[in-house]
Amino acid sequence: MNDVAIHAALTIYEERPSGSAVYLRVFYDGTATGYNGHVDLGTGIETALGQILAEELDLPLASVRIELGHTLSTPDQGPTIASETIQIAAIPLRLAGAQARAYLAAQAALRLNAPIADIEFREGVVRWGDHSCTFADLLQGQSVALLLDRSSIVKNPSDYRIVGQKAGRRDLPDKLRGAHPYIHDVDVIGMVHGHVIRPPYAGRDSGAFIGQSLISYGEDAVRAMAGFIAVVRHGDFLGVVAERTDQAQAIAEALPVQWHLPPPIEGMENLRDTLKAQPSTPRALDSSGNFARGIGECDVTRTRTYLWPYHEHGSIGPSCAVADWNDGNPVVWSGTQNPHMLRGDLGVLVDLPAEQIEIRRYQAAGCYGRNCADDVCGDALLLSRAVGHPVRVQLTRAQEHLWEPKGAAQLMEVQGGLKSRNLHAYAIDTWYPSNRGPNLALLLTGRISPEPRTSDMGDRTIIPPYRVPHKHIVVHDMAPIVRAAWMRGWHRFWTAKSRAAAPRR
């Protein structure tokens, strides 16, 4: 087969303000690659998305490859949260598969002089009766690009042969053998090692002292230590670079540093009162019916208050990243769950267009929401820019647990009632102090201001899934008290069930 035929492919893409977003490429040899901007956090989406694409293309699962979270090739589909990969992010991939199959079927019908309805796909070969042709025959050495048609007709689930059937997780064999490459295993030619020195305001990301607390450090005291390459400072960001990771940590621990101490956090011993007293802005999500009237019509009522404390991820492995400044075209190896958002943050950090930064996503130790995976990418990139080499940074366990955005504390006041044994009225007010955990390097360097920010969170599952005539659902948006971001919503599964299970008065 000639070189032209070998490079032939059918591409399904979408135009966006930021450029073309490719969802699928079908190749001459009967294989296909799907592109999805989400990442696998241990849920097996690589296999699941492969099944979806193989189903629509009528290809064997082994002939389908899925590329996840690589900013150079995958579309920006937002963060990998909840179950949105299959519910939302898989939709254009499924449509692209259906569209590609329809295109190839139409080409085969012309080539074989056959009714398009009688065209069959088997193992990457297109057949009509005793006649057949390959994808290479249909592509004829051409690269074809089609705009995604969101009206493409996908398969009826009753015709599924792959989706819904058992399939071995592609990632598990190597993981079970200890051969799977995690972010901690990345080793780049010329790589050196960094270690960061955090300020004394651990776990805080708002206040006038953020980025303004470093008084001095004594580089002369450590310059002669084994492996020393550099000390790097930007505002309150302070790190060292050395030839080996153990040398970097030893130098960081020996470096004399003087800080201004932050003001204490008041009121954490009584978290309920502290949350209630914080400045907040109420945001009504559902005020259908008339709750005041409805609760008065109830035969049975309940009023409960629930306090959810701060939680940490407690990941089995501290966050790690490798960054290569690469002469102003950075490449970052990361365990992030938000590769495209991370790319934007890093662009702000080093004053580059986001599109000029490449994020290569590797699986990490995992978390239940936002942890330090993005922070450590900023650390590594600042150090790499300073020394001109790829730099690996891995936090210590203490740094990880002290600085990770905690699952936000939450106060929930719930009232509800039954009328004739049916849900009739339900109200919940919740206070949720979070700002989504801005990238720490942006704050420490002063690239973004540290004033308290509110974020419209705390509402993900707050509206009950039941029919309730009278509702009053309110989130009180508030700035964080300590560094906090998302960690698994509990509204629906905890407050609603707790209210239902409460003893009668």
For each feature predicted by the language model, list its residue ranges:
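Cofactor-binding beta-sheet edge motifs in enzyme active sites
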Residues: 1-505
